[in-house]
Structure formats: structure tokens, C-alpha cells
Amino acid sequence: MPAVTTKFTNDDQLDLVMFEKNIHAQLDAGVHGIILGGTLGEASTLLDDEKRTLVREAVRIVDGKVPVIINIAEQTTVAAIDAARKAVEDGASGLMMLPPMRYKADDRETIVYYRTVANSTELPIMIYNNPVDYGIEVTHEMFAKLLDACSNIQAVKESTRDLSNITRLKNRFGDRLAILSGVDTLALESLFMGADGWVAGLVCAFPAETVAIYELAKAGRSAEALEIYRWFLPLLELDINTKLVQNIKLAEVATGIGTENVRAPRLPLIGEERNKVLAIIENGLKSRPSLPDYKNIYSEA
């Protein structure tokens, strides 16, 4: 699933034309869902009405082909409940949820936060577990309490950077909790360890390659997946960087499905920093691999 970027015009308005172009590229590549309003989506800079516009537009564009998921990253429980309500009104299929923002909630507070929001909606929820960047970890004991209390908590975006955590989660929760890798540079390793999916970043610029890796890995064609992944890794490393938004938007420009515009306080890359990123992108494009017919992988069997 792509965690898509938010497209802006030169005068800092939503660029819905380029947004639609990118979503169609994702659908053409065979993605299994669209995630809006994450870190890559510059959610912290978006107005509430803009988030709602993006959800409605995405729902219109995908036309039922794949689920549309909106991220919730709020400072208060009341605001999170309100965001969930609006997601339903706007036609979203599910929610991705970070722990409370700014305030570092303890385990009990985090559990109550998730439980209260989950109980306020019928939408399925994917917990975004990223203690590295956000400072709060949802532990296995916390997951056990949440899964017992909330049937609509169904998945985790696993971004702890601990590959063994995938095995531990599978051993403890089995199919009750779907696991999606949330770190581009650990994606194939995570799939080999049993992750169910991949919430991806560079997919915004390279949708076909990303989906090919996923489909090949799931079909047991690991050597083919690994060959593409090795080519992809220098590009994937652009996602594990504080300038990931700017990096990936540069890549989207290079592949013709995005613009470089970001929203302040972010600024476009300049100088040597920009040139280094462009060199990585250009090297990747020069050696871009031919892909197998990954869309018909199972009909070939």
C-alpha cells in the first residue's frame, strides 16, 4: 500500500490534477490500497478541510477498486474521534492511527486512547507502531489488551526496525493481527519473515517495482524479488531520512507522476543536498530493471 504524498501547486494549493495522475499510476501498478495523511503526506501541515478533500477525491478516483485509508495523528482523544467520524462521512475504508501526538502517553493512556477511538467507529484500524520516530511503542502486552477489547483493530504498520518482532507478533497473535512492514529498507526482509504487506514510500515514484517485489515475494519467487530489491535499495534509502518528503517528491518528478512542491516550513532541496539525491535517482533510472509479468503471477502457475 502506498503512503502517498500530497501534491501542491506552485501557489500552495492542493494539486488535485497531479494527485489523480499519481493515484491512477498506483492503481495501474496493482497496489492493494491507498493511504493518505501520513508523514509522507505532510499531514501536520494540512488543514482539516484539505484532508477531507483528499479522502473524497481518492474515494472517487479508486471507485471501489481498493480501500482508501486515512491516517489519524491527533493530540487529543476528542479530535481523533472527530477525525474518525469525518473519515466515515467522506467514504474512507479504514484508519491508520498513531499514538497521541506531542504528549508522550504512558502505556495505560495509549491503550485507553486507541480503545476509545476504536470503540467510536466501525472502521477497521491499523495501528502505526513507530517508536523510533514518535517515541511511543505499542508493546505486545498492549496489543493483547487492545485486540481483546476492539475487534476492529486489525493490523499494525510495523516500524520498530526489529525484524524479529514480526515473528514474535505472528507467534502470539497469528492471523488476528495483520502485519505490514513500515520501513522501506526492511520491506523484503519483513515479507520473508512473514509480514502480510508493505506500507511503502518510494512506491509513490516507482509503483510497478514496489508491487512486483511484493507479489514475487508472496508467490515464493524470492530470487526475482531480491534482484529487483537490490536495484531498489539505494532509492529506498531516500525514505529513511529526515528529508524523506523532499527526496521522494524529487523521485516522483523524475518518473513523471509528481511535483517538487512541499508545504512550509519544509522547503525544496537545493545545492549539493539536492544534487546527491538526484544522482541516486538518475542512477536508479539508468539501471531500471525489466519486470516479470507480476500481475498474472498466479495464473501462470
Enumerate the language-model features and the residues they cover.
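A general structural signal for well-ordered alpha-helical segments in protein cores
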Residues: F19, K51, V55, A80, ...
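Catalytic alpha/beta core domains of metabolic enzymes, predominantly
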Residues: N119-S120, D133-T242
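Active-site beta->alpha loop and helix N-cap motifs at the rims of alpha/beta catalytic domains
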Residues: P2, T6-G135, K145, L291-P292
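Short, amphipathic alpha-helical "lid/cap" segments that border enzyme active or binding sites
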Residues: L16, E20-I23, H140, R274-I281
